[in-house]
Amino acid sequence: MLKIALESLGCSKNLVDAEIMMGILNNKGYKLIGDFEEADVIIVNTCGFIESAKQESIDTIINFAELKKTGNLKLLIVTGCLAQRYSEELKTEIPEIDAIVGTGSYQNIDKILKELSEIHQIVSLNDIEFVFNEDLPRYISTPSYMAYLKIGEGCSNNCTYCIIPKLRGKYRSRKFEDIIKEAKKLAESGVKELVVIAQDTTKYGFDLYGKERLSELLEELAKIDGFKWIRVMYSYPESITEELIQVIKKYDNICSYFDMPIQHASNNILKLMNRKTTKEDILNKINLIRSNIPDAILRTTIIVGFPGETEDDFKQLVDFVEEVKFDRLGAFAYSREEDTPADRLPNHIDEEVKIQRRDTLMMIQQKISEELNDKKIGKTYEVLIEEQIEDNVYTGRTQGDAEEIDSIVYVKSVDNLEVGEFVSVQINDAMEYDLMGDVLYELA
């Protein structure tokens, strides 16, 4: 039987697609391996969101294509957003690719693999309105204690800078019962941290049920035995309701963590971005969250250098960040994407100015983060242990930190700790982003 290796690039939503492909292939008897040098088949699940992601995807494909000459590689399959967006270019420019599979076709990966024995090159770009369901097998690739739960696909927000609606289609929610069924299986498998994802989690349900139902969904997830942390990602500020805040406040196993991409704080730029909110509305929402959950962790992402961004627009953004003091913030220089409305806007910003503004904002955030971390010294936090880095020293995360994108805690312990266990840690030192502490005791 063929040996298959899969490389998934980009976001966690893309990773879930990769896990479904691996689940389908595993069920069909193919051998999944991690050694690309030994693989008969390599699948590259690509990202095509911004220029740097596209370049990473192309570089990865080209590097793997070399294994057709130097390794065991027989078939190279490209899936995901780059495949959906640039199928013809990939077919022409990289002839080593044997199959190009779009975002609405990955569920047919086993059939495509079988067809490749008869056809040299396949391009499969089916209807991108496909939504996976719980009946499709899934091969979880994350650590055994955590898993992603994708509750929807696509996006209908139509922000002017974003290509996702063209790559993934309009927003489609999964059925409520289907999500709960998958969540129960994940809990039974030993998952302790459940990370709820979609392009916009707060829009969940509006297309299927005529109203947003994230708060109801979280209530049902919170009642499932086994989940220690339930984390919600990608929540848009205009759809964070008081009802949702109260549900998060009510359940101890729902993290008081709000991943809320605001993108900007100048009303002029927000309008040009086609964001459905204003600076005043965002501030009111933040105050509503903090008045109900004083220790809530607020994470956001911001785009600087958007077309038409003046010095005054940027100053408004800086002032807003300094006023709000987000716990976590990622700033990105605007990436010009063809086939988006923003690409056609006048007054594009020079690359040097974009980078300078990004760096300025991140320096401000670094000081804010350091101030907030200093206040944590002497306090005790629940920490999920993720890795042992040396004798008696481990790294982990608090419930205020999402995997890979947020901060870590360096933990000292005289006793051996297990990866995936929760411990109580007293913080004794702090850096700009990370914390250090000692184990007080293990948690059940």
UniProtKB/Swiss-Prot annotation:
Which residues belong to any copy of the TRAM domain?
374-441
**E.C. no:** 2.8.4.4
Any one GO CC term of this protein is: cytosol
Has keyword 4Fe-4S? yes
What Gene Ontology molecular-function terms does this entry list? 4 iron, 4 sulfur cluster binding; aspartic acid methylthiotransferase activity; metal ion binding; protein methylthiotransferase activity
Give the record's cofactor note, including how many are bound.
Answer: Binds 2 [4Fe-4S] clusters. One cluster is coordinated with 3 cysteines and an exchangeable S-adenosyl-L-methionine.
Q: Where is the protein localized?
A: Cytoplasm
Binding of [4Fe-4S] cluster 1 occurs at 11, 47, 81
Instruction: Report the residue ranges that make up the Radical SAM core domain in this protein.
Output: 141-371
- UniProt keyword annotation of Transferase present: yes
Cofactor dependency: [4Fe-4S] cluster
Which top EC class is named for this enzyme in its record?
A: transferase
Q: Which reaction does it catalyse?
A: L-aspartate(89)-[ribosomal protein uS12]-hydrogen + (sulfur carrier)-SH + AH2 + 2 S-adenosyl-L-methionine = 3-methylsulfanyl-L-aspartate(89)-[ribosomal protein uS12]-hydrogen + (sulfur carrier)-H + 5'-deoxyadenosine + L-methionine + A + S-adenosyl-L-homocysteine + 2 H(+)
The record lists its disulfide bonds as none
Q: Enumerate the spans annotated as MTTase N-terminal domain.
A: 2-118
Matching entries from Pfam families are given as:
Radical_SAM, TRAM_2, UPF0004
Q: Which GO terms describe its biological process?
A: tRNA modification
**Listed PANTHER family:** RIBOSOMAL PROTEIN S12 METHYLTHIOTRANSFERASE RIMO, RIBOSOMAL PROTEIN US12 METHYLTHIOTRANSFERASE RIMO
What family does this belong to?
Answer: Belongs to the methylthiotransferase family. RimO subfamily.
UniProt protein name: Ribosomal protein uS12 methylthiotransferase RimO
